[in-house]
Design a protein with these regions (language model features):
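Active-site nucleophile-adjacent alpha helix/oxyanion-hole segment immediately C-terminal to the catalytic cysteine
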Residues: 96-360, 425, 435-438, 445, ...
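Long, positively charged binding patches that form subdomain-scale interaction surfaces
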Residues: 332-407
């Protein structure tokens, strides 16, 4: 979803006292005791999970401690990692040096890096980074496309509280949906729905607001009201109010939601004028454009002729999947994924790049990466060296045990091949131009295998047998499935 939004939870970080100055030196003994207490707490919790509540005894802890201290490497690692960010300490210099921004295949036209800032709009930024390329090519202008318009309409349309009023409020489904009744995350098929229903506009006629770039507080307000409204509707249903009464109440509730969003983002234009000079100095002017006209006539990108392919090794390949209750527009196309092997996904991506087309994709961006360096590489952080451990789960197992899921959307714009095999990939991110190479990242091919889950292709660029899978009746994954996480 974005640079500031994590979708997996872990142990909360504990901020401990430090020896930053002489005044605090006498607290060092307390610090050691605190750390020892935390260590025992972690181990005891872990043992409780594995052994059904049996606590570790002092003899076992002493045995672990003796073995730990008998290895000089452990003491060296402790001294280094305790005092700095472990990812900095364990950074694999050789891997970082080899992850260079040189690619044998690269699309001819690239835009400047965009910045989603403190929001979860990566899916929209990645989409408009794809959409702007036809505008740059055909009109010789680097005008950005507005995301706030799509952001507002996405927030408005991902709300339906009446359909599930009879579901038990404590059911897993309701608790999951109440966990994030609305957000600024999304999926590619949601992009198609927004473009087809509302169109898109140049950024100059509908610029960013503070709240589109910093969406946390707006999301909180809307989420709070939606939970409140859900409660009210369920109470009305329990008191046997008619469906007409519920719908009338919902219409009034949605007016309130619209007001909150309009105040925070501004209303998107219904009609606008667009004037600019191209790179050759030629002047253009367009008057009375609607967002849908701009999308159809100026952008001229056929989003409806694209589709999503995923690599989900938990399920059989060459089948169609969807996620229950995942969508944004009533009557729009549902979320659909064609499941394919990872090697097929890579070959299709290479073919698209060779034909000069960027490729929108979804991945688990927080794994084995350094955002300041702009590197995505399984070898980059050497946890094995620092902790003498190995991570042994397969991609399917990580999905099954909540260790991985799609968290971010970006765009492939290049690949480096050796003997026709991919070595590294060029990635257009939306975290500003100060990371990586002016906002572009490099991805090692092994990282693609483990952490890339989805790509989007034009149907004409995919084998017909994959396009034909879209005619299948989709198998429905539950609402909380990790294949829907990018929209949460």
């Amino acid at each position: 979803m974005g640079q500031n939004k994590s979708r997996l939870s872990s142990f909360k970080k504990r901020r401990l006292p430090s020896k930053a100055n002489d005044e605090k030196h006498n607290k060092f003994d307390d610090l050691v005791k605190t750390n020892e207490h935390i260590l025992k707490s972690y181990i005891s919790t872990y043992n409780h999970e594995l052994e059904g509540g049996a606590d570790l005894n002092e003899e076992s802890l002493q045995k672990y401690s003796d073995k730990f201290n008998s290895e000089p490497k452990n003491r060296l690692a402790l001294n280094a990692i305790c005092n700095d960010d472990m990812n900095k300490v364990l950074l694999n210099r050789d891997a970082a040096i080899k992850d260079i921004h040189v690619f044998s295949e690269k699309i001819q036209l690239e835009g400047k890096a965009t910045n989603q800032k403190s929001s979860g709009r990566c899916w929209l930024f990645a989409a408009t980074n794809v959409l702007r390329l036809p505008v740059m090519k055909n009109w010789k202008t680097s005008n950005y496309l507005s995301l706030s318009c799509s952001f507002m309409t996405s927030l408005k349309k991902r709300i339906n509280m009446i359909a599930l009023v009879e579901e038990d409020v404590e059911s897993r489904l309701i608790q999951f949906l109440f966990g994030a009744p609305v957000s600024d995350g999304g999926q590619w098929d949601m992009v198609i729905n927004l473009l087809e229903k509302y169109g898109v506009v140049p950024k100059c006629v509908y610029p960013e607001s503070y709240n589109s770039s910093n969406s946390g507080r707006l999301n909180w307000i809307v989420t709070t009201k939606l939970r409140e409204f859900a409660y009210q509707l369920r109470e009305m249903h329990a008191s046997e109010k008619s469906i007409e009464v519920l719908r009338h109440a919902k219409a009034q509730m949605m007016e309130e939601i619209y007001r909150i969003i309009a105040i925070s983002l501004g209303e998107p234009p219904k009609v606008f004028d667009w004037t600019f000079r191209d790179k050759d100095g030629k002047y253009y002017e367009f008057f009375g454009l609607t967002p849908k006209q701009f999308y159809g006539e100026i952008v001229n990108y056929k989003a409806t002729e694209t589709f999503s392919l995923v690599n989900d090794p938990r399920h059989p390949y060459f089948n169609l999947y969807t996620v229950e209750y995942l969508g944004n527009i009533q009557g729009g196309i549902p979320i659909r994924y064609v499941n394919i092997p990872i090697e097929t996904m890579k070959q299709l991506t290479i073919q698209a790049l060779r034909s000069g087309k960027p490729v929108w994709f979804g991945a688990d961006v927080g794994k084995a990466s350094d955002s300041s360096l702009g590197i995505l590489d399984n070898r980059l952080i050497d946890y094995e060296l620092g902790f003498n451990i190995k991570f042994c789960m397969t991609k399917a197992q990580r999905l099954e045990y909540a260790q991985s899921l799609m968290t971010h959307a970006m765009v492939f714009t290049g690949v480096h091949l050796e003997d026709d095999r991919p070595i590294r990939w060029r990635v257009e991110n939306s975290w500003g131009d100060e990371r990586g190479e002016k906002g572009y990242f490099v991805m090692a091919d092994g990282w693609f295998d483990d952490w890339v889950y989805q790509i989007v292709l034009e149907k004409k660029d995919a084998p017909n047998e994959l396009v034909e899978v879209l005619k299948q009746k989709p198998q429905i994954l539950p609402a909380w499935d990790p294949m829907g996480s990018l929209a949460i």
